Amino acid sequence: MAPFGRNLLKTRHKNRSPTKDMDPEEKEIVVWVCQDEKIVCGLTKRTTSIDVIQALLEEHEATFGEKRFLLGKASDYCIVEKWRGSERALPPLTRILKLWKAWGDEQPNMQFVLVKTDAFLPVPLWRTAETKLVQNNEKPWELSPANYMKTLPPDKQKRIVRKTFRKLAKIRQDTSSHDRDNMECLVHLIISQDHTIHQQVQRMKELDMEIEKCEAKIHLDRVGNDGANYVHEAYLMPRLSDEEQKLDIQAEINQTLEDLNDSEGMAQLEEQLQYYRALIDKLSAEIEREVKGAGIDGIEDMEGAAACELENSDLESVKCDLETSMKAGLTIHSHLSGIQREIKYSDSLLQMKAREYELLAKEFSSLHISNKDGCQGKENRGKEAEAPSSNGETPPLTQRVFNIYTNDTDSDTGISSNHSQDSETTLGDVLLLAT
């Protein structure tokens, strides 16, 4: 223990203001005593841990008097060094000020706590191993203990008896003090654990606050960069792109159908299909060569591997374009086959209509021939009727009426019934007048 410096130590309650921190030049430290922060000032480079414990116990005894609860000697206590969840008991002769300065920037995260030695560690690490007493079973005498006591002088017997009674009294006192010490150790252990739990809860709250601050900062950055609805847009953009892609494909199909309606649509479509097929074959060959070359070059060095990765990415993009073009070509081919089937169907319909037209023409010609034969028979009958006339000449009126009848019957589609009846009555009247 240092010969001086202990009497200069003073303790006081720390100010609860969170903004005030310890000044290392003031040569003072903060020690937790039963959930209270106490400042120990007047430290020197020779001040040890046991000096600080003695000063704290004296201040506690002066403050509480008979109601004090820190009982025992300074050697029964120790100062525990706590840092970020780890703990270490300081030996009694630790230079406390040197240790405090050694922490440097980590001083705000380090704390000193006064605890009972037995509550923290039953066997402190700084104690050396004590010599074990091995009882010698071999007795140097052959007599019994009672007979041996009788052989001793009276004064020595009295000393042995007094010593025995003193030992018994000490054993009784140690038993009562041991029970009391056990209770004190239990109380200090509970207090220390409660203090540790409070520290852990406080640390968890601080971490939660830091996490919330980081999340808020990230949210503000995303809002500043992508807008307030960046989450909504992030989930809807893929769907919108899919819809736009579908609309583009539909527009291409419609454009292709419109092109097919033109006279040169079929030829252009065939040229496009041939071009795409040639392009696919060419790109497939290039892809195979590039893949083989990239595999061989990638084994040689890292730069070649990076170049191969870039080429592979380009090849993948080209493959995607080829797949898209192939799908479009297949769609166009399917539409082309459908249009070809429609054209064949239209040709078959035209052929059927042509055959029907030929049949109708034949029927029309046959009807026209039959009508001509009927007209000639009627002319012959008229001539035979006019032959018995006296002068053998046809009157002009009769000839004019016969010409009218001939013109009326020379129709390929026939005459209406009313018109034919009127013509027959007129002819009969004319014949009667002529006779």
Swiss-Prot record:
PROSITE patterns: RA. It comes from the Eukaryota. It is found in: Endosome. SMART domains: RA. Residues 388-397 have a biased composition (Polar residues). Residues 1-22, 371-397 are annotated as: Disordered. Its main location: other. Residues 195-291 form a coiled coil. Residues 375-386 have a biased composition (Basic and acidic residues). The keyword Hydrolase does not apply. GO terms for biological process: signal transduction. Residues 25-119 form the Ras-associating domain. One of its GO terms (cellular component) is trans-Golgi network transport vesicle membrane. Interacts with PAM. This is Ras association domain-containing protein 9. It comes from Mus musculus (Mouse). The gene is Rassf9.
